[in-house]
C-alpha cells in the first residue's frame, strides 16, 4: 500500500524521512502536523527528536525544555534532552537526567546501558561499575556483573557505607554465579 495523504500517513512519512536522515523534510512534515494538532505531545516529541538527531542541539534543548515545563518528567522528552546533552558532551548533565529516569525505570536495560556509558564518559567510574553491573545482571550476564561489582568495591575502598552496600550486592549476586560443577 502506498503512503496516502491522511495525517497518519504523513506522520509515518516523517518517521521514514527521519530514518533516511532527511531531517529537513521530516521537520517540514511534522511541523505541518503540529500546526494542525498544536496540543499533540507525540508530534511535538517527534519534532524534538528530529532536532536532536539532526544535530541541531540548541534548538532541540530549547524546544524540549519548553515541553518538559508542560509535561514534567515525560520519559521520551527527558531521554531526548539527555541525548542532546550527550551530543554536546555534557555528560554530567546527561547523567543527572538519566539518573532521574532510572528512579522510575530501575530495570530498563537500555537506560542502564546508556547511563553506564555516560557515567564512564563523565569519569564517574564508581557509578559506571555499579550501573553497568545492574545492566549486566538484568541481561543475565552474572559473572560479568560480579566483576563490575568487585571493581566498584575496590574503587569505593575509602567509603565504608558504599562498600557495605556493594558487598551485600556481591553476596547476593554470588548466589547466581555457582561453580560449574555444582550446577549439574
Regions found by a protein language model. Give the residues of each.
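Small-residue-rich helix-loop
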Residues: 52-53, 80-83, 87-89
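Structural marker of alpha-solenoid helical repeat scaffolds
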Residues: 36, 70, 104, 121, ...
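Intrinsically disordered, low-complexity segments enriched in Gly and acidic/Ser/Thr residues
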Residues: 103-132, 137
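Short coil/turn linking the two alpha-helices of tandem helical-hairpin repeats
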Residues: 55, 75, 89, 123-126, ...
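Extracytoplasmic and endomembrane cell-envelope/extracellular-matrix remodeling and assembly machinery
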Residues: 1-66, 97, 141, 151, ...
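Alpha-solenoid helical repeat scaffolds
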Residues: 11-12, 42-46, 62, 76-80, ...
